[in-house]
Amino acid sequence: MRDEISSRIRRLPAGMSGGRAPDFALAVYGGAFDPPHPGHESVIRRALLCAERVALVPSHRHAFGKRMGDFELRCRWLARLARRIDPRRVYCEPIEAGLMPDRPAVYSIDLLEALAARSGLASPRIALLIGADNAAELPRFERAAELCWRVGRLGAEERRPLHSSMIRQRLREGRAVPEAWCLPEVKDELHCYGGERQAG
């Protein structure tokens, strides 16, 4: 099964642009998770084939200025999801809430430096896990060249065309959200995005 990962997750070691990387100690999966959905779960499960642990890091202040749902609620959703997948290897890391309070956003490079310091791991043992929706944005990341040099990257290709914005739009329009779009940890609390109809 581990060999199958090459077509689903591209592994890049720190300081390199290609080739096969060794397994990482920690994969850091940051994002709005607004809300988390089955596409996120798929990425997490595939990343576990490349990393010993996966940290789910919800954005507290978005680097590109997006407005997001309640931070504490998104943390609860991710913590529940982590427990269902594997509580020993997956966890929600709300570290962004306390990082760089004087800045408008927490950048990936700052986050990874903080996690390396907290965990005691050398930066090359940490990988930034990037979903398909953010892969094209990587060159726009703060200190992108340094980021790519210092830490590894796990690039997850999209296996289903599903994004959080699609769920939010359905709810704003008062339309039912397909059951296949919803995680069990989230579906009963989607009313926080407005609209009256839940998963159907």
Model-derived segments and spans:
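Nucleotidyltransferase catalytic core that binds NTPs
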Residues: 1-200
